[in-house]
Amino acid sequence: YWSDMNKKLISTIVNLDNFVLKNRMVNATLVAMQQTLPLLAICVYVQLMSHLILSPNALLVTLFNWHLRIPADIQLQEMLSLLEVFVLMILSASFTKHFLSMRKIAQTTLPTLTNFLGTYFLFLGKGQTPTYDTSQYLLVILLSFISCESFYFYQKFVSGDNPQPFAVRFLIWAALILLIDVALHFAIQR
């Protein structure tokens, strides 16, 4: 009895795993995460060094009563924030390129550039140095997915065969996506 139940459970898990891995969104996310992993590792190590040594209330500074004078602490925090946003921008661009390639779209330059810039507009504001967590990666993937699907359907139903990649109708689409990202920026920052 237990062996039959275990076989059914394992078979169900394998089928579910195969279904998830064949999903375009999951596959593009995995490829994008693999491509951004080296940059993400650098970002994590730089953040770790900052929190252990470089910030005024760092762990090692507090434990050993060091009196380090970091003249550009605010600029360092802004640079770390920019590095985090840059990782998110690369993730968005990589996801867009791979997802649209799986959808058999040859001209991916404009949507990739649009999502790259959209991520920048979404997360950076004038004079702000926000901190991010892993939910930001999910938000970037979700917004990139919605943008990619809108581009796919816009190209398929509006432009027809052999579209020019930077035609006015696609530039209007890109401007609309960027305006949505800017509006979401203000909604998130409230």
Q: For the regions a protein language model found, what residue spans apply to each?
A:
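Hydrophobic alpha-helical transmembrane segments of multi-pass membrane transport/permease proteins
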Residues: L37-M49
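Solvent-exposed, non-transmembrane amphipathic alpha-helical segments
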Residues: M49, I53, N65, N115-F116
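Signature of multi-pass transmembrane helix bundles
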Residues: W2, N6-L40, L68-R190
